[in-house]
Amino acid sequence: MMDYTESICFSAETAEELNRKAFSLDCRLFMFAYYEPKQYREAESKRSQFLTAIVNLYGLFKDCGSFLGELLKTRDTILVTPKWKAIQNDYNMLFQAVTSLRSIFCHNNSLCYPLNEDVLQRAENSISEYLPNAPDIEDITETQWTILLQKLCTAADDFFQELSSNMNLLVSCKDVSRKNRIITRWITASSSC
């Protein structure tokens, strides 16, 4: 049985590490404010653990680091790695999955309204990214929830590892002018959310 307690989905350590790197650039910077993920009990179903991971990631993206999407929009913000486009794509895919899945699990979405059908379709598409040929959400088995949880944790951890590697490059960047532009944009983005 896989232990997910070290994943960003259930642990604040990666977020705190990114905050330390941001702070080392400039004492006014942070990446995520006050991330406190909810824990799961081993006795819970994998579906419940998956939902907890979704709620935690949503909180991380929307409550703690709502400006991250803005910072990742263009290469000339915080992204200094040659893999900047992949980081943007991974963020967009993960954010889309988290927001659509949270929407169907945490809101009263009657399927008799077209808007809710769109949300359900996006959620099912997100699940299909992690579990090809997945059944309807209500028919997913415990084994499939286990696979979904593992793949979600892996995708989130991989994304944040790439972001951390990028932060290492940014911290060691010798182009002071570029670094100062990035810091200014970062402060502006974080203060506007």
Show the residue positions of the predicted features.
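Histidine-centered, metal-coordinating catalytic motifs and their short helical/loop contexts
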Residues: 90-132
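Alpha-helix initiation/capping motif
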Residues: 65, 108, 138-141
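Amphipathic alpha-helical interface elements
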Residues: 1-86, 90-97, 151-189
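Extended charged low-complexity segments that act as oligomerization/scaffolding linkers
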Residues: 114-115, 133, 140-147
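Short, highly charged low-complexity linear segments
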Residues: 116-135, 162-176
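Acidic, Ser/Thr-rich low-complexity intrinsically disordered segments
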Residues: 191-193
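Short, surface-exposed, charge-dense and proline/glycine-enriched linear segments
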Residues: 102-103, 142-154
